[in-house]
Amino acid sequence: MRLSRFFMPILKENPKEAEIVSHRLMLRAGMIRQQSQGIYSWLPLGKRVLDKVNAIIRDEQNRAGAIELSMPTLQSAELWQESGRYDAYGKEMLRIKDRQDRPMLYGPTNEEMVTDIFRSSVKSYKDLPLNLYHIQLKFRDEIRPRFGTMRSREFMMKDAYSFDLTREAAEHSYNKMFAAYLRTFDRLGLRAIPMRADTGPIGGKLSHEFIILADTGESEVFCHKDFVDFDVPGEHTDFDSVEGLQAIFDKWTSLYAATSEMHDEAAFNAVPEGDRLSARGIEVGHIFYFGTKYSEPMGAKVQGPDGKEHFVHMGSYGIGPTRLVPAIIEASHDDNGIIWPASVAPFDIVVINMKAGDQACDDTCELIYAALSKAGKDVLYDDTDDRAGTKFATADLIGVPVQIIAGPRAVANGEVEVKDRKTGARETMTIEAAINRFVA
């Protein structure tokens, strides 16, 4: 992508409405624009990051055996009345009526709808276990939306819903998602700590929030410091192994970790003083096991091996991609801008032409741009006629992991400079060596 043809409306000044680093940098880098209170457009740079976040989420959901579907954003109020949540949910839910004056709602979550899909299609235990997920825009009318897309009214969620015959089987499905979430956040460059959490309006018997530690976090959290160094489940994790997944769950829940809502001061004080960690955190995922809370009132049941009908045991598992993007920025930035993990960076490499219009610089940059693009790299080519300082500031602000800088003096010697955005390390090398480093 040539920067001269890319839509990336950079802001030179810090926006006054931004309270936290991620909101400020997302606005300055031209990733998002606010359309109304708590509602944002995702501009091309931001959407590239969001798409890569979603790709990792999908990959890990598929690996764990979940199956993707798509459900509508508008839902019938009848389903929510059936579950008993229509009146209980409160003013966060946007209620509307269609032209026939039928009550509808803009879904804040999808337990009722997916249960309706299940009960109309699945009748036998032989079709279990089943885990269905989707990634969708949702709306909750927050009283005080703030921090950009960290806490907005319209937001994107990955929701998965598991269906099992027994509690034991449902707990295995829960453990699958538990391990999948650990892997997902690790691939996104985040260290997420699972903490026992309140079930809130979703309800249920078991719940964990996945929290990343950050000074700007809204929640106060308390945990054992060893969580920071725990090994995440590997790529070859067997998601069919009951014992293996239970061992992962047991390890990651063996030490004290709780949000402020579930905090037990006495239990925390039992942790050796040098091992206690009190901090602020950002919730990036939430999983629930709620048994038959929805299946019983909505009649979601299957015939078991005993020939009798059984209400299915359910779980739900949420990750907010539009919340994850600012969370990643909160965890990885410096005074100059964003430092993206390679897995979600909008571009892999930015090629900076220090003197656009200079034939040697132009030819060198075109050569590098073409070679890296052909090799499958996402490359941003800064071919603008901006001053060198502006180009460097832009590259640092948007956080592309690698900068390849071509200036007249270096190019005259057949060389370019390669800069690592995270470490700031610079290395001069031949043009061929620079290409080969990222093509090989």
From Swiss-Prot:
InterPro entries: aa-tRNA-synt_IIb, aa-tRNA-synth_II, aa-tRNA-synth_II/BPL/LPL, Anticodon-bd, Anticodon-bd_dom_sf, Pro-tRNA-ligase_IIa, Pro-tRNA-synth_IIa_bac-type, Pro-tRNA_synthetase
GO terms of biological process kind: prolyl-tRNA aminoacylation
Catalysed reactions, as listed in the record: tRNA(Pro) + L-proline + ATP = L-prolyl-tRNA(Pro) + AMP + diphosphate
Compartments, record wording: Cytoplasm
Cellular-component GO terms for this entry: cytosol
Sequence intervals crossing the membrane: none
Main location: cytoplasm
The protein's Enzyme Commission number: 6.1.1.15
Keyword Nucleus carried by entry: no
Subunit structure: Homodimer.
Task of the protein: Catalyzes the attachment of proline to tRNA(Pro) in a two-step reaction: proline is first activated by ATP to form Pro-AMP and then transferred to the acceptor end of tRNA(Pro).
Family matches, as HAMAP family: Pro_tRNA_synth_type2
Protein name, as recorded: Proline--tRNA ligase
